[in-house]
Amino acid sequence: MMRKTTILTLTLSLLSSVQLWAKDYRVSDFGAVADGTTLNTRALQRAIDVIHEEGGGRLIFPLGRYVSGTLHLRSGVTLHIESGAVLLGSNNPYDYDREPGLNTAFLLARGQKNIGVTGEGLIDCRGRQTAYNLVDLIHRGLVDDRLGLDRPNESIRPMIFYFRECDGVTVEGISLKNSASWVQTYDQCKNLKIDRINVESNAYWNNDGLDIVDCENVTVTNSYFDASDDAICLKSHSGAHMCRNILIRDNVAR
């Protein structure tokens, strides 16, 4: 009896600690400006890093328009985009990170745990203009790409999400719009939940709505996909991995 009581007490203590860590932070507290023109990458990345270092929580985006380049999502951090809030992707291709082994994206994560994007707001990456600007840089010799099929390789055009080798991912309620490439890619991720999202992406070539690559334990439910390429696509890029335990139910795709 004493052992059971000790275990229960320890469990409740741990749950209490998790609740204390899971605080809400507002982007304005880190200097983000919601005017639709100011580049907020540095302020937003600092906010994500601080929340991660403090043990996790939600970064709240209230009503407004927030421009940013690539953001790196960290373990324990959820971006919560409220109704009326819009995250706008920068139209400058140089504002997006290019790292070995990772595709270019507005929101990047690799090897992170318990991350998410939630709320009733919108992420609009304005991909058509960003892709056109990238083509211009290639023609001027400032970016190296052979322009196969008269368009930049999809790996250097920014997706909205690229999450790789992450465990415990929640994407819920939000709208995603106008990627310059695939909209969202989850590569070798585990325990992924996608629910009640709205995807409208007809901005450019290769506008897949959702790509699930070598993932395990995935649910995709109650969502809408309007994409100019594959709406929902399961893939494998590695001989050592495969898609396993995937549930896709009650969605609309066109």
Task: Pin down the residues of each PLM region.
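Short amphipathic alpha-helical "recognition" segments used for binding
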Residues: 7-8, 49
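Intrinsically disordered, low-complexity segments enriched in glycine/proline and serine/threonine
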Residues: 6-7, 22
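Positively charged n-region of N-terminal signal peptides that target proteins for export
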Residues: 1-5
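Bacterial N-terminal signal peptides
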Residues: 9-17
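Extracellular/periplasmic carbohydrate-active domains that bind, remodel
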Residues: 21-254
